[in-house]
Regions:
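Clamp-loader machinery-focused feature within the broader ASCE/P-loop NTPase space
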Residues: 1-125
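Charged, glycine-rich active-site and insertion segments that engage polyanionic ligands
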Residues: 1-50, 70, 139-140, 149-225, ...
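Conserved adenine-binding aromatic site and its adjacent loop/helix in ATP-hydrolyzing domains
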Residues: 100, 132, 155, 159
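Loop/turn-to-beta-strand initiation segments
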Residues: 110-113, 139-143
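A short beta-strand-to-loop transition that corresponds to the Sensor-1 phosphate-sensing loop
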Residues: 118, 146-150
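Residues immediately C-terminal
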Residues: 121, 136, 152
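Conserved catalytic/switch belt of AAA+ P-loop NTPases
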Residues: 128-139
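Positively charged, low-complexity/disordered segments
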Residues: 228-230, 234-240
Length: 240
């Protein structure tokens, strides 16, 4: 689990989350939109940890209180990750894991937070079931949907959520992070960041992938090698 200061970029989003934690005024339903690997899940986890943090400090999550330690180990009883066993997230899974348990008050925290990654995988029936829950949630209930394809979600779902747009980071920021955390040569960090186009998750995978390095070298060779036509021209005798 990261603190807000350890998460790269997304400064405005982090400021909004920290204000919601500080003022104790989170929205009841969030929709985190952005491509896979851009940082949605990392910030969702940190946001949930900060909301549940028991520290008196303004710098939350503290990583030291009981709740933060539970978050670190994945055992915080009032932060629930909604999972699926099949390609889609069906109505029965949404009802069993979220809708039917929302009315049960938090066990030991101020909020009951549900995190739904890949929310675009929800069937229409599942979305309609969720809609009824987020239309009239209990005071302590918070749902955070994460998606890389917002158009797959019903307009009624979108309209009842606070949409948070996760945009690509600058190539320089991604390159610096990869260089520091992946311990790769400068040229490899630079190439990984360039090919990732601002997606930190992709850049990290590229930096650690031997297959990517080989493909990148092959592509660079194709661009730098002379074409057959150029080679033919180079062999032609120059005119007197």
């Amino acid at each position: 689990m990261f603190s807000f200061s350890e998460i790269v970029g997304h400064e405005q989003i982090k400021e909004h989350m920290q204000a919601a934690i500080r003022d104790k005024k989170p929205f009841h339903a969030y929709l985190f939109q952005g491509e896979e690997g851009v940082g949605k899940e990392a910030l969702a986890r940190t946001f949930a940890a900060g909301l549940q943090c028991q520290s008196e400090s303004t710098d939350k999550p503290c990583k030291e209180c009981v709740s933060c330690r539970q978050m670190e180990s994945g055992n915080q009883p009032d932060v629930i990750w909604v999972t699926r066993e099949k390609a889609s997230l069906g109505v029965d899974e949404i009802r069993e894991q979220l809708c039917n348990t929302m009315d049960i008050k938090p066990f030991s925290s101020p909020y009951k937070i549900y995190l739904v990654p890949e929310a675009e995988k929800m069937t229409e029936a599942a979305q309609n079931a969720l809609l009824k829950t987020i239309e009239e949630p209990p005071e302590y209930g918070i749902v955070i949907l994460m998606t890389s394809n917002i158009s797959a979600l019903l307009p009624t779902i979108q309209s009842r959520c606070l949409t948070v747009e996760f945009r690509p980071l600058s190539t320089a920021v991604v390159e610096s992070f990869v260089k520091e955390h992946c311990q790769v040569p400068d040229y490899q960090a630079r190439a990984s960041a360039a090919f990732a186009q601002g997606n930190l998750g992709k850049a990290m995978r590229y930096a650690k992938s031997e297959d990517f390095i080989e493909r990148k070298d092959h592509i660079c060779l194709l661009y730098t090698s002379p074409s057959p036509r150029d080679r033919q021209k180079s062999r032609m005798p120059s005119s007197a």
